[in-house]
Amino acid sequence: MFNSFGNIFRLTSFGESHGKGIGGVIDGFPAGIVIDEEFVQQELNRRRPGQSVITTSRKEADKVEFLSGIFEGKSTGCPIGFIVWNENQHSNDYNNLEKVYRPSHADYTYTVKYGIRDHRGGGRSSARETISRVVGGALAKLALRQLGIHITAYTSQVGPIKLEGNYTDYDLDLIETNPVRCPDPEKAKEMQDLIYKIKGEGDTIGGVLTCVIKGCPIGLGQPVYGKLHAALGNAMLSINAAKAFEYGDGFKGLKQKGSEQNDVFYNNNGRIETRTNHSGGIQGGISNGQDIFFRVAFKPVATVLMEQETVNIDGIDTTLKARGRHDPCVLPRAVPIVEAMAAMTILDYYLLDRMTQL
């Protein structure tokens, strides 16, 4: 049951990093939506490994194959099944991990919980599982387009290098013009240089992604335990390496007084809006029609190419030096994953909202 995400729109994923493939089944997708398979593939390409010198060198085509739920280019309302075959596994790179635990990975917790683990690339705990999320998110984006809802994420911080402005201060069309996926070209160059330097040291680094949802209607969210920001937080923190989530002004708002933090209402030609958006587009757990924006912090990748202390499966102290192909920073490839999780959450809550009133 915990391999599924969503309520009405529901993604169930399967597969491991070094297994035969990664796939999923989507239930609750509305019928009659035009399925642009080229767009879905483009989204996968944004997540795909081997994009640049600051990502893992693993080469995978990551071509999605739809198995059901689509007829003559449109969704039928039936379950949509899909799979992406793994083609470039180097499982021998992980032979030295069979009997030792990698620091800050899921190796130890998986072993204790299940009594068995797939040591090849982390198995089910690998970020390769997010392929299914990106496919599900791409389909959700296609449905949300028809509702005028658009979702954009970008890198806003790598280590100590960060954007000081809000998302409104940047041209978001510049995000895809650099490998870091940052809308500020100068900061993007600094971030890229830092990641490349860290990679050369055999180390890794983390940072922050910012996500903006535009066009979200008023009323999405289910009080008390189904608040929209709680659902978005759950979605984001389910992503590998995600460590923190804040929406609106978040922790920065703690420096303000209530009179400064409040978003006052006004009548904008018959439409009630707020003069500011400290709330991040959500009040009382329900969308208020303003832009929804939030940030997700990602830790440095746990696999570093230097010797570390650890223990083996018998609890004996030893050392470990990782091998294989790994990202020095997850942020560039996490951008489409954050967008995907946001898209699936918003579509799910949109469908839930249709049940509120007859």
From Swiss-Prot:
InterPro entries: Chorismate_synth (IPR000453), Chorismate_synth_AroC_sf (IPR035904), Chorismate_synthase_CS (IPR020541). GO terms for biological process: amino acid biosynthetic process; aromatic amino acid family biosynthetic process; chorismate biosynthetic process. This reaction introduces a second double bond into the aromatic ring system. NADP(+) binds at R47. It comes from Bacteroides fragilis (strain YCH46). Its cofactor is FMNH2. The gene is aroC. CDD domains: Chorismate_synthase. Its EC number is 4.2.3.5. Pathway: Metabolic intermediate biosynthesis; chorismate biosynthesis; chorismate from D-erythrose 4-phosphate and phosphoenolpyruvate: step 7/7. Homotetramer. Belongs to the chorismate synthase family. This is Chorismate synthase. One of its GO terms (cellular component) is cytosol. It comes from the Bacteria.
